[in-house]
Design a protein with these regions (language model features):
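Conserved Walker
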Residues: 22
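Conserved phosphate-donor/acceptor-positioning beta-strand/loop module used by diverse small-molecule
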Residues: 53-70, 98
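Pre-Walker A (Motif I) flank of P-loop NTPase domains
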Residues: 5-9
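Conserved substrate/cofactor phosphate-moiety recognition/catalytic segment
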Residues: 15, 25-55
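Hydrophobic anchor at the beta1->P-loop junction of P-loop NTPases
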Residues: 12
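Conserved glycine(s) of the Walker
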Residues: 19
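C-terminal alpha-helix
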Residues: 111-119
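Small-molecule kinase domains that catalyze NTP-dependent phosphoryl transfer to phosphate-bearing small molecules
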Residues: 73-111
Protein backbone atom coordinates (compact mmCIF):
# COMPACT_ATOMS: atom_id res chain seq x y z
CA UNK A 1 0.00 0.00 0.00
CA UNK A 2 1.46 3.36 -0.97
CA UNK A 3 1.42 6.36 1.33
CA UNK A 4 -1.27 8.00 -0.81
CA UNK A 5 -3.53 5.02 -0.11
CA UNK A 6 -2.97 5.46 3.64
CA UNK A 7 -4.62 8.89 3.86
CA UNK A 8 -7.60 7.62 5.81
CA UNK A 9 -7.68 8.42 9.53
CA UNK A 10 -7.37 5.64 12.10
CA UNK A 11 -8.74 6.26 15.57
CA UNK A 12 -7.32 4.24 18.45
CA UNK A 13 -9.43 3.88 21.58
CA UNK A 14 -9.27 1.80 24.74
CA UNK A 15 -8.79 1.99 28.49
CA UNK A 16 -5.68 3.46 30.08
CA UNK A 17 -2.79 1.04 29.76
CA UNK A 18 -4.17 -0.81 26.74
CA UNK A 19 -1.34 0.28 24.43
CA UNK A 20 -2.92 3.11 22.45
CA UNK A 21 0.17 5.34 22.34
CA UNK A 22 2.43 2.42 21.45
CA UNK A 23 0.18 1.27 18.60
CA UNK A 24 -0.20 4.80 17.25
CA UNK A 25 3.58 5.32 17.16
CA UNK A 26 4.07 1.98 15.40
CA UNK A 27 1.34 2.55 12.82
CA UNK A 28 2.67 6.03 12.08
CA UNK A 29 6.09 4.49 11.34
CA UNK A 30 4.27 2.45 8.68
CA UNK A 31 2.83 5.62 7.15
CA UNK A 32 -0.67 5.57 8.65
CA UNK A 33 -2.46 8.64 10.01
CA UNK A 34 -3.64 7.93 13.55
CA UNK A 35 -5.32 9.72 16.41
CA UNK A 36 -5.52 8.82 20.06
CA UNK A 37 -9.13 9.08 21.19
CA UNK A 38 -9.41 9.80 24.92
CA UNK A 39 -12.99 8.55 25.12
CA UNK A 40 -12.26 6.84 28.44
CA UNK A 41 -12.27 10.31 30.04
CA UNK A 42 -15.53 11.58 28.50
CA UNK A 43 -19.06 11.25 29.80
CA UNK A 44 -20.42 11.91 26.28
CA UNK A 45 -20.63 8.47 24.69
CA UNK A 46 -20.33 9.67 21.07
CA UNK A 47 -17.56 12.24 21.69
CA UNK A 48 -15.10 10.09 19.69
CA UNK A 49 -17.30 10.58 16.61
CA UNK A 50 -17.77 14.31 17.06
CA UNK A 51 -14.17 15.26 17.67
CA UNK A 52 -12.15 12.75 15.65
CA UNK A 53 -14.61 11.02 13.30
CA UNK A 54 -12.07 8.40 12.16
CA UNK A 55 -12.46 6.37 8.97
CA UNK A 56 -11.31 3.28 10.88
CA UNK A 57 -11.74 2.71 14.61
CA UNK A 58 -9.52 0.24 16.46
CA UNK A 59 -10.46 -0.68 20.02
CA UNK A 60 -7.81 -2.09 22.35
CA UNK A 61 -9.11 -4.30 25.15
CA UNK A 62 -7.22 -4.49 28.43
CA UNK A 63 -8.14 -6.04 31.77
CA UNK A 64 -8.08 -4.20 35.09
CA UNK A 65 -5.04 -6.19 36.18
CA UNK A 66 -3.06 -5.36 33.04
CA UNK A 67 -4.12 -1.70 33.02
CA UNK A 68 -2.95 -1.19 36.57
CA UNK A 69 0.31 -3.11 36.16
CA UNK A 70 1.27 -1.54 32.81
CA UNK A 71 0.64 2.02 33.94
CA UNK A 72 1.30 1.58 37.68
CA UNK A 73 -2.17 2.99 38.35
CA UNK A 74 -3.54 3.12 41.85
CA UNK A 75 -7.11 2.35 40.78
CA UNK A 76 -9.99 0.46 42.21
CA UNK A 77 -11.81 -2.02 39.96
CA UNK A 78 -14.79 0.37 39.90
CA UNK A 79 -12.67 3.02 38.15
CA UNK A 80 -11.71 0.57 35.42
CA UNK A 81 -15.36 -0.47 35.08
CA UNK A 82 -16.32 3.20 34.66
CA UNK A 83 -13.80 3.54 31.84
CA UNK A 84 -15.26 0.43 30.20
CA UNK A 85 -18.74 1.96 30.47
CA UNK A 86 -17.55 5.21 28.90
CA UNK A 87 -15.87 3.25 26.10
CA UNK A 88 -18.83 0.97 25.33
CA UNK A 89 -20.26 3.10 22.48
CA UNK A 90 -16.89 3.31 20.75
CA UNK A 91 -16.36 -0.43 21.25
CA UNK A 92 -19.73 -1.17 19.61
CA UNK A 93 -18.68 0.85 16.55
CA UNK A 94 -15.09 -0.41 16.29
CA UNK A 95 -13.97 -1.95 13.01
CA UNK A 96 -11.35 -4.01 14.85
CA UNK A 97 -11.13 -5.09 18.49
CA UNK A 98 -7.77 -6.35 19.73
CA UNK A 99 -7.47 -7.97 23.13
CA UNK A 100 -4.04 -6.81 24.29
CA UNK A 101 -3.95 -8.84 27.51
CA UNK A 102 -1.79 -11.66 26.17
CA UNK A 103 -0.08 -9.83 23.30
CA UNK A 104 3.15 -7.89 23.18
CA UNK A 105 3.30 -4.58 21.24
CA UNK A 106 4.68 -6.25 18.10
CA UNK A 107 1.80 -8.75 18.09
CA UNK A 108 -0.77 -5.97 18.53
CA UNK A 109 0.82 -4.12 15.61
CA UNK A 110 0.77 -7.29 13.48
CA UNK A 111 -2.98 -7.73 14.12
CA UNK A 112 -3.66 -4.12 13.17
CA UNK A 113 -1.50 -4.20 10.03
CA UNK A 114 -3.06 -7.45 8.83
CA UNK A 115 -6.55 -6.03 9.31
CA UNK A 116 -5.69 -2.76 7.54
CA UNK A 117 -4.02 -4.51 4.59
CA UNK A 118 -6.91 -6.97 4.18
CA UNK A 119 -9.67 -4.37 4.45
CA UNK A 120 -8.31 -1.00 3.35
CA UNK A 121 -6.05 -1.61 0.36
Amino acid sequence: MSNSEKNFLIGIVGPCGSGKSTLIASLEKHGYRCRHIAQEHSYVKYMWQRITNPDVLIFLECSYENSTSRRKLNWLPAEHEEQQRRLSHAREHAHLIINTNLLNPDEVLAHALTFLKENYQ
